């Protein structure tokens, strides 16, 4: 690609300077980031609106297409990695996504903290006089577990995080601090999800839009 300089695959993908110093502004790297955002939004929004339009007449294909639409960020990151450095760039991106950066205790905490907080919230709700939700009967437990696994793996991490965390975060922190990068990603992430609040049948459509 004419707008990319010749560097090592990982450095080229992140836009790091030839001597390893992260430039504050690198036109080639910024174009790569802009391309990632455009591809992520174009894929997810385009398929999402198509899926929403066919929901009334073909609910199952619509649901499947909506799930595929959620892979926009990860697919966009892979595409930009290939355009930047070919197969070597794709391999460098995938290795970075799968890199074990913290101890196993942090993964255990991340896995257990959400259900623990939910239990605490239900306990507080009950202590204040609120009713507890009905538990599923035994026949529904396998379905609940399968749904949990589907959402845990496919509903976000595989489709989104390889893009937001695997590509966009390191690309931004190569030229700014992590706080500013996190703020930018938060805005992009929010805008990427925005159409779901206006599509009937999505979980977001049942939620208010916070201001």
Pin down the residues of each PLM region.
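Short, Lys/Arg-rich, polar N-terminal cytosolic tail immediately upstream
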Residues: 10-30
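Specific transmembrane helices
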Residues: 24-157, 185, 198, 202
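Small-polar-interrupted transmembrane alpha-helices in polytopic inner-membrane proteins
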Residues: 44, 181-194
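Membrane-interface helix/loop boundary segments of multi-pass membrane proteins
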Residues: 159-186
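Membrane-interface interhelical connector segments
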Residues: 163-173, 197-208
